[in-house]
Amino acid sequence: MIEKEEGTGTTSELFPPLLLRSGQVLKNRIVKAAMEENMAGTGQLPDERILTLYRRWAAGGVVLDEHSPLKPFAEWAKAGKSGGGAIWMQINQPGRQIPSGTPGVVWGPSGIGVSMGRHSSRFGRPTAMTPRQIDDTVTRFAVTAHRAEKAGFDGVEVHAAHGYLPSQFLSPPVNKRTDQWGGSLENRARMLLDIVRAVRAAVSPSFAVAVKLNSADFQRGGFDADDARQVIAMLEPLGVDLVELSGGSYESPAMTGRPADDSTQARGAYFLDLAKDLVRTSPVPLMLTGGVTRRVTAERVLYNEVARPTLSERRPHSGSVVRATHCAATEHQ
């Protein structure tokens, strides 16, 4: 939650509207980042508890959201937009980062499980996906985006960060494939790019499409800032409205507030230094997520650090929300 306080200037950079490539206009530059509320009702559907929560968030500004019958989701979208902002659905496939005992097959780019020492057994051992399974997953993202638009959401965000499935394909230590989805960065990014193409084709031109991407995996030999720069450039021709920058995975949870650089932590924005570097060459607006909890920090990011930022914040229970637009900063999911 971004605390209310006096800003750093008479005209705050947090509040001007942001025109996206799709033509959608966001009211300001603060976003509630997508998260797991763990509040689903019977049948894993949104119910009155989550609608109440989103009405409260909507009173403060723009929101992003996560993942059946369409009516409960339509009610969810309506609640999220009740304050006049926009609501986007985040679409995710966890891949190997799925708890042990979950029904079904655990998928991954390769048969490499999550390595967390004595906690590794908490996650299922993945099976390397076949080309047909990869194509089916791409289709499922597109179908979900189409249904999200029908339900009244204003956009979707493809989750390709935090060690989830598209992020696993991007990561050299996890993706050991030798086919068209492995090896070079272009091959490792193929699944994500195919997902974005399919999603963009499945929705209307005015429907926003975003991607959540690691600025770095924070693992030896992993996806890094230079990789992120190249992937952002690959996404631009596909009609992406913005890219949300985060970092880490379950194995290296930088997104929880454990960044590699202590000075960045002290300044309150976990991935600010990486974002400052990436924004110089990014052809699309960037949203910065992680650790921006005070208005003065958010304004410093916008005034002095990241030229085109969007600030996202998440916490379901407390205080007022300072509204904003362009690129954002928050806590992870």
Which residue ranges define each predicted feature?
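Flavin-dependent oxidoreductase catalytic cores
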Residues: 1-333
